[in-house]
Amino acid sequence: MAIAPIRIVGDPVLHTPTAPVQVAADGSLPANLNGLISTMYDTMDAAHGVGLAANQIGYGLRVFVYDCAEDCRQTARRRGVVINPILETSEIPETMPDPDTDNEGCLSVPGESFPIGRAQWARVTGLDADGNPVTTEGTGLFARMLQHETGHLDGFLYLDYLIGRHARSAKRAIKSRHWGVPGLSWMPGEVPDPFGP
């Protein structure tokens, strides 16, 4: 098992768009990609996350892994990887997000959560770990995760989309925790679960 430190908001790799994974003419993927994917799964599992983008552990590649239910009330989860994802969504609501139903967290903003409006439905197309075409879609929590992870790969954190008092609360939290600077990370399994009880 290989667990990597998770970068915290302020690290440049989180705020830079990732590069597509290069696919060879024969359709094969880079030989070292399976090792990265394995580390991503191990890290996500150790952190109790529902998704993890490669740049969250310092790799500027367009890859994310997930282990996520359709919604918070379900125990059945879907697990997978998407390489070079392209996101499609339904319309994003223009109303103020509901703090009771629209809260979102991020492993790169450990222990914090803020309400954010997201599309109710999302789909990503890309490649699986073997280089085969893959499409995955969902609603609710699963759609939120797809939007969140592809946002990471585009160089954005969910904090970048917060509005009003929620954006101000996030700025205060970052300042009080002394985040927002390069080089900060946390190690899943070595510190208490930041989203746990």
Swiss-Prot record:
The keyword Ribosomal protein does not apply. CDD domains: Pep_deformylase (cd00487). It holds the Pfam family Pep_deformylase. Keywords: Hydrolase, Iron, Metal-binding, Protein biosynthesis. One of its GO terms (molecular function) is metal ion binding. GO terms for biological process: co-translational protein modification; translation. It is an enzyme of class 3 (hydrolase). Fe cation binds at C106, H148, H152. It catalyses: N-terminal N-formyl-L-methionyl-[peptide] + H2O = N-terminal L-methionyl-[peptide] + formate. Transmembrane segments: none annotated. Its cofactor is Fe(2+). Its EC number is 3.5.1.88. The keyword Hydrolase applies. Removes the formyl group from the N-terminal Met of newly synthesized proteins. Requires at least a dipeptide for an efficient rate of reaction. N-terminal L-methionine is a prerequisite for activity but the enzyme has broad specificity at other positions. This is Peptide deformylase. It comes from Mycobacterium leprae (strain TN).
